[in-house]
Amino acid sequence: MLLQPKRTKFRKMHKGRNRGTKVNDNISFGQFALKAISRGRLKSCQIEAARRAISRAIKRQGKIWIRVFPDKPITKKPLEVRMGKGKGNVEYWVALIQPGKILYEINGVPKELAYNAFKLGASKLPVKTTLIGR
């Protein structure tokens, strides 16, 4: 179940810059959360891999919320194609992550189990993270 938008106004986007920080991004749904402390881009497959690792670690008890959604298309030109001739095709989708962004939330599990689950999930992600609680 790779995440991507159902439909967008435009197929391709400018690269843009990933600056700024998320100020006061609090826990909304769960009791414990995985919070990013560095910036980066999360692919939809990385978001799914971390979700699977977390749900397996908590043995499907409790509830998980995914607080990020990959809404930015990343394009790539085919191998051995000369420069020019337009922008490449959409290869995958990413979510831009700033420091302070809440990535996942969990409810209904003990603190130790949540910590271990988030540790397994964080190992699948390319950004540095920390565990926070209410």
Swiss-Prot record:
Annotated segments matching region Disordered: 1-21
Protein role: Binds 23S rRNA and is also seen to make contacts with the A and possibly P site tRNAs.
Gene Ontology MF terms in the entry: rRNA binding; structural constituent of ribosome; tRNA binding
UniProt similarity note: Belongs to the universal ribosomal protein uL16 family.
Any GO BP annotation: translation
UniProt-listed InterPro entries: Ribosomal_uL16, Ribosomal_uL16_bact-type, Ribosomal_uL16_CS, Ribosomal_uL16_dom, Ribosomal_uL16_sf
Subunit structure: Part of the 50S ribosomal subunit.
Cited PANTHER family: 50S/60S RIBOSOMAL PROTEIN L16, LARGE RIBOSOMAL SUBUNIT PROTEIN UL16M
Native species: Blochmanniella pennsylvanica (strain BPEN)
PROSITE patterns xref list: RIBOSOMAL_L16_1, RIBOSOMAL_L16_2
Annotated S-S bridges: none
Cross-referenced Pfam families: Ribosomal_L16
Keywords: Ribonucleoprotein, Ribosomal protein, RNA-binding, rRNA-binding, tRNA-binding
Gene: rplP
NCBIfam families: rplP_bact (TIGR01164)
A single GO cellular-component term on record: cytosolic large ribosomal subunit
Name of the protein in question: Large ribosomal subunit protein uL16
Basic residues bias: start-end ranges: 1-20
